Amino acid sequence: MIDIGLHSYALETSERNDGREWYLARTEGFSPTGEMALGLSGMSSAYAMHMSHLSDLRERLGEIRYGNGTDGLWVRGFTEENRLSGLGGTDLSQNVYGTSFGYDRLLDQDENNKWLLGLRGQISRAHQRVDGLHGASGDNRSYGIAAYATWQHAEGWYADTVLSWDWYDQNLKTRMLDGTPVHGSYHSYAGGISQEVGRMFRFDNGLFIEPQLQLSWYWIKGMDFTTSNGMDVDQDDAHALTGRAGLVVGKKWDLDDSRYFQPYLKGGVRHEFMGDQKVTVNGIKFTNDLRGTRGYYGAGFDLQFASNARIYAEFEREDGQKASTPWSVSAGLRVEF
């Protein structure tokens, strides 16, 4: 068996009236190089890594309503597994590890309105594997910056806006059928904006419910690259428009005048309205399509353990046909002064 371009071929024979005929017949599936390129050249990995950093306001910063200072420093780490659709019917899995960190300042507009303005940096890395016949793998590194502005109202309303810019370094590798190593790499960049709104309804016993809506747009620059054995890949730009409707239910326990513990449950749906990218591999066009609805649920908590310091953590699971996250764990620390 040999691999030529996107496909593999086996030597077969047939009987003819004038003798035996030998010919190359295409086998099912893709060649090792084709499987690698189709699994790891679409938008899926970068899209999932962006969503991990963006998440929602509560997961990203924890509970921001009960701060005791005007300036804040925070750091958050997370790890998760993604299962994603690639090009040409391929599938990939990736384990992502990331950290974000930031500084913000709380500004009083009047007695009912406050603004939290901040900047953050972020880094993450994904170890990837194509779920196919030949064991292709990859490594995607991401670096980014973001600015955010969060409006809070005394009656529980809030609105959170995030502007982000990211860079991606993608490496991919496999082996041809004869054992020859094959590799490729490309560098891309992306930008996005997100708007989240919601309202917390508080009750006298410390219980609260918080309905949320979020809409985010993300653009990923398409790049061209050639693998070490000559396979050409040409990506179009990718666009994603993701809507989310969710609900948080929790309870706040005051431990003393300056400390509290607040656990919560969350759930909702995300819908990808755009989420497709055209990629041409050796002259053949494929589409990476992530459109569809995904359901999510999770649990988390905030613990104010000192007058100016708080930890927060969350577990979440998301299920969808073309993109899913079997598990995601994050934790953060915020210090105010």
Give the label of every model feature segment.
Residues 1-27:
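Extracellular, surface-exposed repeat/solenoid domains
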Residues 212-213, 237:
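Short, well-ordered beta-to-alpha junction loops that form the rim of enzyme active sites
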Residues 26-205, 314-316, 321-326:
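Outer membrane beta-barrel translocator domains of Type V secretion systems
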